[in-house]
Amino acid sequence: MKCGSELVEGKRWASVVFTHDYSDWSTMEDVSQTGAVWWRVVRTKDSIEAQCSKDGEKFTTIRQGYFPADVKVMAGVMCAAPEGAGFDAKFDQLTLKTA
């Protein structure tokens, strides 16, 4: 699973992709078009849930999906530009932590 903000046709979207034999992409209008966005992933038994927030307090669920209970969850950051000339990215005040 990967989750984050995606720029599609000039608009920012909250994006979650699950891959288990095939990929399943879910999007919704991002919680903030210009400001900071917090992401949280919650694991419960054999599923994970991707949530985002514009204030780090109130989170909205974007997608929940199957994730085998015996598989370790790993987290990291990335940027990608599958089309065009690319872009500059800045991660500011980045924190990765477990609950």
Q: Language-model segments: which ranges?
A:
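Extracellular glycan-recognition regions
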Residues: 1-99
